[in-house]
Amino acid sequence: MALERTFSIIKPNAVANNNIGAIYARFESAGFNIIAAKMLHLTKEQAEGFYAEHKGRPFFDGLVEFMTSGPIMVQVLEGENAVQRHRDIMGATNPDNALAGTLRADFADSFTANAVHGSDAVESAQREIAYFFAADEIFPRS
């Protein structure tokens, strides 16, 4: 296994439902170090830029609207095999298909309001981390 970084978002519904602490506790219990974190409220332009790969898809406008509907938490997680392990604890994108005990099974409200986002590959993690964090905002602890 390799020490990796992955990017994570706690989405507006989970922030509004006061689930930040519970989700952070799950990250730390799973062996992740949270090496960068901040709360922000995305502008339409920021959301469209972040999700640019989905532009033109039927769900794009709804996703942008949801992601700009309230504050989010963005964080960088570091740990062994971080990208895949984070995806495993998030659960299936559709919370109806998420295994019990996963973040989406426990905190999602719907397919769009599915509580969390996580990078799908090391390369996308690097791109997503750089979208929200400068190098001097990341503090490795390992």
Curated annotation (Swiss-Prot):
InterPro entries listed in its UniProt record: NDK-like_dom, NDK-like_dom_sf, Nucleoside_diP_kinase, Nucleoside_diP_kinase_AS
- In which residues is ATP bound? K11, F59, R87, T93, R104, N114
UniProt subcellular location:
Cytoplasm
Q: Show the active-site residues.
A: H117
Molecular function in Gene Ontology: ATP binding; metal ion binding; nucleoside diphosphate kinase activity
GO terms, biological process: CTP biosynthetic process; GTP biosynthetic process; UTP biosynthetic process
Q: What class of enzyme is it?
A: transferase
Which reaction does this chain catalyze?
a 2'-deoxyribonucleoside 5'-diphosphate + ATP = a 2'-deoxyribonucleoside 5'-triphosphate + ADP; a ribonucleoside 5'-diphosphate + ATP = a ribonucleoside 5'-triphosphate + ADP
PROSITE patterns reported for this sequence: NDPK, NDPK_LIKE
NCBIfam families the UniProt entry points to: PRK00668.1 (NF001908)
Entry similarity comment? Belongs to the NDK family.
Q: What is this protein called?
A: Nucleoside diphosphate kinase
Organism listed in the record: Yersinia pseudotuberculosis serotype O:1b (strain IP 31758)
